[in-house]
């Protein structure tokens, strides 16, 4: 199979960007040399981020990596709805004119916020230009002095950024999705903080509905039960990041919280627009008190220009598609395709042997068995030293996936992440499965041969390309 030039050129560009730079900068000023030395730490593990072009938008590769989960961008549905929305307001302003509290507020944004709040079962909504800034706003405005934050160890970087600048001095992580570890963390905080014991301060619990690197789902119901037990004075509040649940989970994509009927139990929700909704921004859902706290204490509200009319209009357009049921078929197809992948990959004749040899593992299959839904995120594990080789194998097979490495995940936890979309097909899934097992079979043959130093063909091609670009 011929590999498109774009894939080869992108791989070559990526490899070039991983070359160490600092050793050639001895005559540079300390400012630039120190920056390059820091970047070389990333380059040394092939984890240097670059501005590489994607290979799926033009059809060079099959998209199993993008965030266009409902395929609203690819199909043009969102564009059509957006242009229709703009046509209703021919005199719209391009510029909001200031922050939400300094002249930049306007009727349309308030109307859209309330529509979203009503749709998702919240009292209020407050819009942000990104999910990252929404999370930072939450943690820099909501925790009060004396409060404590108990958080899942795998929460987003934006949550950590916000927590680091929060007024909560006590922050305790618990082992990912482990309700026993969560109980221990809650008890530890309760026993060590007198003001929380007497009910005058609160424990804020930070979790995500769906975890972006593992694809698993937060046990929200069980965690709420534990929190009620540990905090009889009800001085706890859950903050739930719904970035990967919005548009995917629940009827009409309302997210995990509303799907479980927990709208009244969760104090703060972050619902982003940059994943399934195929646009940008986020909304923070909560009570009027929560909204007022952010309007007064969050710098990313008070010191940032309010979202413009077009950016609000495209978010409204996306939620219109959800609310009217226009995306339900896409949602259902994601559920079908993920289950189809699970069945196809786990029924392969090499599945058990590959698992036993550590060549292939997909823990999310087992984790999903007891739920009435699956998520679109499917991490694929192989041996750590083979992770890049599997990535090369799939890239050269014209399959676009994402290699997840340190520092995105802890050292020794590298994996490939597959994202399944509404417009993927069964035949594309079949091809993906066949290519995964093509790699597995090749590695089995290499190991059986006992030939030292032998590497798979895709890796040979990539390393030859690296040498040619040295």
Swiss-Prot record:
Keywords: Aminotransferase, Pyridoxal phosphate, Transferase. Pfam families: Aminotran_1_2 (PF00155). The keyword Transferase applies. The modification N6-(pyridoxal phosphate)lysine is found at residue 275. The keyword Oxidoreductase does not apply. Its cofactor is pyridoxal 5'-phosphate. Its EC number is 2.3.1.-. Pyridoxal 5'-phosphate binds at residues 212, 244, 272. One of its GO terms (molecular function) is pyridoxal phosphate binding. GO terms for biological process: biotin biosynthetic process. Pathway: Secondary metabolite biosynthesis. It is an enzyme of class 2 (transferase). Belongs to the class-II pyridoxal-phosphate-dependent aminotransferase family. BioF subfamily. Aminoacyl transferase; part of the gene cluster that mediates the biosynthesis of sphingofungins, bioactive molecules acting as sphingolipid inhibitors via inhibiting serine palmitoyl transferase (SPT). Within the pathway, sphA transfers 2-methyl-aminomalonate and 2-hydroxymethyl-aminomalonate onto the sphB product 3-hydroxyoctadeca-4,10-dienoyl-ACP to produce the precursors of sphingofungins E and F. PANTHER family: 8-AMINO-7-OXONONANOATE SYNTHASE, CLASS II AMINOTRANSFERASE/8-AMINO-7-OXONONANOATE SYNTHASE. This is Aminoacyl transferase sphA. The gene is sphA.
